[in-house]
């Protein structure tokens, strides 16, 4: 049997996060889910555009992650917008919480994927970009695309 392609197990990516924030310090975190939530994720019914990580009582929670109810779950439906606990080591939570205390910094999810049958979340520390920085980024990416097209032509 052949192995799956390396990027085939990605559930969703938060492309908007790269546009709004300057991202650094990536971490892989587990996430505490119910069975119907995992089945809904396998179907791709997730939206985490406005989600972020909140720190309470020495624990990390993913807030704003919307996982649509699973169609075949029956009467035991999950709350689609509940806060979900992230599974990180205590020292990782302390480091992330310390970085969020600085003004203008937040922790945002960048990717949701399956790794060895478990759902994982890629989170990163982000600092909000100003509007002119976002525009400069778009211009630079457009120029890079144009140069790649020119190079591909020859």
From Swiss-Prot:
GO biological process, one term: trans-translation
Keyword line: Cytoplasm, RNA-binding
Annotated compartments: Cytoplasm
GO cellular component: cytosol
InterPro entries linked: SmpB, SsrA-bd_prot, SsrA-bd_prot_CS
Main location as per UniProt: cytoplasm
Region Disordered: start-end pairs: 134-154
GO molecular function, one term: RNA binding
Function: Required for rescue of stalled ribosomes mediated by trans-translation. Binds to transfer-messenger RNA (tmRNA), required for stable association of tmRNA with ribosomes. tmRNA and SmpB together mimic tRNA shape, replacing the anticodon stem-loop with SmpB. tmRNA is encoded by the ssrA gene; the 2 termini fold to resemble tRNA(Ala) and it encodes a 'tag peptide', a short internal open reading frame. During trans-translation Ala-aminoacylated tmRNA acts like a tRNA, entering the A-site of stalled ribosomes, displacing the stalled mRNA.
Family to which this protein belongs: Belongs to the SmpB family.
The name this protein goes by in its record: SsrA-binding protein
Protein species of origin: Nitratidesulfovibrio vulgaris (strain ATCC 29579 / DSM 644 / CCUG 34227 / NCIMB 8303 / VKM B-1760 / Hildenborough)
Phylogenetic lineage: Bacteria, Pseudomonadati, Thermodesulfobacteriota, Desulfovibrionia, Desulfovibrionales
